[in-house]
């Protein structure tokens, strides 16, 4: 549930000149356009009054106090001499912290704020947007230790980007989100139609983030020009961290290699990573995924308990679980059946231990529109397309 205790407009029913932050000059603290900032000492009372109305009307289970973690603690200091702690950052920091903690109790669920200065509030809120307005992640080195070791155990911030729309920008958006151990924001948001970039973003990140967001970082290494993996102290002293080629190991065994370099490929034991490429694997093999070079072309692949994802990016790509020249999603249903969803694919094939008993073509409303057939060839079962089919449900004996 959206709520805001940083921007108060004169048309608000709670407007009162005496609850506004006073500057050293005695003037009101300006906030967003046509708005002024309420006193930090008053925001908890405002929250309690407003959230009780929200609960009665909507009964939400999560909150979004906007702007709260976008501003640094010293930019909303109240200099009103009538207020205890006037002119100190501690008074507003304490009040904002109490607000964020209380909201989690009120909603009995997560509370996420905006972004920009969220590191000051780690542990006080469930999380915030991951953007740091003062740092250019697309051009500057990725130094991930502070976030992964200090912030991530306290708060789960999300998404290092704004929904970039080119393929190159999206690749970098995904890679930096993985490098900093964040869940990925839904690319493009609700404003845009579902397209191949959104599909790629969801399937490349969903299973991977389910593993690293539920674990703590164990080891961080940065590669130098020789491929040697250095700890952060040696990486900084030698300048190797500027290459942004990072190996992460989490305490659940997950290992991730991310090439944040803008120009150079990075050959690792299991893959050849292009700029913004990555490789991840759980030690038991339940999850393996990569965005890497295959036969000179970049491809994307996920093998996981819930689904397999194969993306040839317009080129024919033969993966362990299937093959396609577009995007291919293989959903693994609990009853043992498989739903095959192609997108932009001229040919699709899947690797199966046995031939399906039935292949049912479904439309977008999941209505049956016919039967398909498979042709075994080259270690795969090639699915014969059915006009108008959105997906194919494979059933086995």
Labelled PLM ranges:
Residues 2-18:
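Active-site cradle of extracellular carbohydrate-active enzymes
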Residues 13-354:
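Active-site-proximal substrate-binding groove within the catalytic cores of carbohydrate-active enzymes
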Residues 250, 343, 376, 385-387:
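Surface-exposed coil/turn segments at beta-strand junctions on protein surfaces, enriched
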Residues 290, 360-380:
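Solvent-exposed beta-strand/loop surfaces of large extracellular or lumenal domains
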Residues 347-352, 380-386:
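Exposed aromatic-hydrophobic patches
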